[in-house]
């Protein structure tokens, strides 16, 4: 069962990544989520575990705010996209595939 789910999310990872790229290139979207995470997380650096990170949008925002982020996803495709995005956006986030 897990293999079927992982396969589906990996198959869709390109579409999700396209959506993330559009969001990250939209200053209003990035500004909105940056403000929301600041309110939610507070000013002190935290250790954050994002489960179901997909291509890594929230992990990128949290890392930009100075938090230590570990991002986990069950899909090898999503993990691959998240790793590429962390490198592209110059963020240090530990990313791993877990179910």
Predicted regions and their residues:
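Class I SAM-dependent methyltransferase SAM/SAH-binding core
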Residues: 49, 55-99
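Conserved class I S-adenosyl-L-methionine
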Residues: 1-43
